[in-house]
């Protein structure tokens, strides 16, 4: 797979040759093992065969091979969630920002299909509130279904645009914003993502990200964290 020249130039200027080459290798040649995250409240009696633990997530596991999850009742019961290990890294962000305080209200602004929301809810202490939001109504339905299967309490699922949270005024201790990105992580999965990449697309995503963050910013309390 040949990566866009503008992309190669950008990452080399930002990272240097060694790290840029390692990133290119990861995006084009490295096979990604299937990983799952265990639901700490359900303790499944049986899991697909595991290979090793995900180092940055206490409940994350790599599988030896990818099974047909649709045939596994444990999957449908919400005993585990299939999620790329990279997405589990938000656990490290949570542990970093909670060294000096315990968040009482967390907003996951762009939450569908629900992988990160289920992890946020597993990390938050009992009695705290998670608001899992997805602006697109159809995707919000998938989000609600996955949160229901996960089965943990103190979750509100909403379908609102970022600016609709602003009137709450300093309500949330943490706002997690998985804002739209230019999709370099999809290169290994979809060659179409390589063809669609451009500097213009990156700039457009950056502008959209800024608009989203500005819109929701008033809902974050002073001293809170935007992730």
Write out the residue ranges for each language-model feature:
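S-adenosylmethionine
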Residues: 1-227
